Amino acid sequence: MVLSKYLDLPQHGAVLAEYIWIDAHFNIRSKCKTLDKKPTSIEDLPEWNFDGSSTDQAPGHDSDIYLRPAAIYPDPFRRGDNIIVLAECWNNDGTPNKFNHRHECAKLMSAHEKEVIWFGIEQEYTMFDESDNPVGWPKGGFPAPQGPYYCGVGTGKVFARDVVEAHYRACLYSGINISGINAEVMPSQWEYQVGPCEGISMADELWMSRYLLHRVAEEFGIKISFHPKPLQGDWNGAGCHTNVSTKSMREPGGMKHIEAAIEKLAARHKEHIAVYGEDNDMRLTGRHETGSIGSFSSGVANRGCSIRIPRSVAKEGYGYFEDRRPASNIDPYLVTGIMTETICGSIPDADMVEETKRGEEEGF
C-alpha cells in the first residue's frame, strides 16, 4: 500500500527495463535501466553489463560480463510501458559466458525448426517462510501424512494460495503461456504448467515465470525452493516433468515416432540424467511417483516410469510423451536442448553434454 502511490506517479515518457539473467548457480539476478522510449523489438534494446565477479561468472581482474537482450515481456509489477528483458551473458571477447546455455540450445532449435518441436513443462516448487519452515507446517513438527493435499481445497489442506493466484495473474499479464496450476502431493508444494511452447521459447518462458514467482513471493515474505527433495522422509520430491512432441508425433500415426523417440532416449539415459538437475538422486528413488535414477523405463499411464505415454495418446495413436526424470531445479535450456539433440539429431556445432561440462569446469 505504501509503494502504490509512488507507482502511480508519471514517468514522463521514460520506460523502465528490468534486465534479468541466470548466474553461475542457476539463480536469477536482475537490475533496472531507464530507456527514453518504449522499444518495439529486441534490436531497440541496448547491450548492458554487470560485475561478473560478484555472481561467480568472471574473475575479479576481468569482471565485466555483457548482457545481450534475448526476449521482452510486459512488467506486471511496474506495469504501463515498463518491461522485463531476458538477457544472455557474454564475455568481453565475444564468446558466450560458460553459464550461458541458451546460446547452444538456440542452435539446436534453429537447426531442427522444421520438426516444430513443442514442449510443456510442469514446474513444481515448495514454499518456506522467513524462518525456513515450510508454509503451513507446525513449528518444529509435521502435518498429517500425504493424501488430502493434492489438488486440495480448504484450510489445512492448501497453503499460500494467494501467492499462487498472484503469480498466475502476473504470468498472464506478461504473456507467459501458463496453462494451469494445482496444489501438489506434499503440503506447501505447488505446481504450475507452462506450454505448449515451441523451440527456444519454452526455456525462455520458464525462466521468466520463475523470476515472476520469486518477485511475487517477495511481497508475501515467502521463500521459493526448487530443490528436488526439500524435505527428507515420506514426502514427495519436486520435479519438472517435461512433455514433448514433434509435428510428426502430433499427426495421425504419430505413435511410431513417439516409440522411436523413446528408444533414442533409452540409449542416452545417463547423458540425460547428467543434465536433469542437481541432487536428482534424492528424488528419483523409485518411490513417490518416480522411476529409479539408475535405470530407464517407459509405459502407458505409469507415473513410476522414466517416460510416460498418456492413456489418451495411446488410445488415439498420436500426441506427445512425458519425461518424468527432470528435477525441479533444471536449467530448461539444457533439458530442452538435449531432448532436441537426442530425438531430432545432433548438429556439428552444438553438444549439450559438453555444454554441461563447460559450465562445471573450474575457473573462467
Curated annotation (Swiss-Prot):
Enzyme Commission designation: 6.3.1.2
InterPro entries found in the cross-reference section: Gln_synt_N (IPR008147), Gln_synt_N_sf (IPR036651), Gln_synth/guanido_kin_cat_dom (IPR014746), Gln_synth_cat_dom (IPR008146), Gln_synth_gly_rich_site (IPR027303), Gln_synth_N_conserv_site (IPR027302), Glutamine_Synthetase (IPR050292)
Annotated compartments: Cytoplasm
Subunit organization: Homooctamer.
PROSITE patterns: GLNA_1, GLNA_ATP, GS_BETA_GRASP, GS_CATALYTIC
Annotated organism of origin: Yarrowia lipolytica (strain CLIB 122 / E 150)
Domain GS beta-grasp, first and last residues per copy: 15-94
Identification of the protein by name: Glutamine synthetase
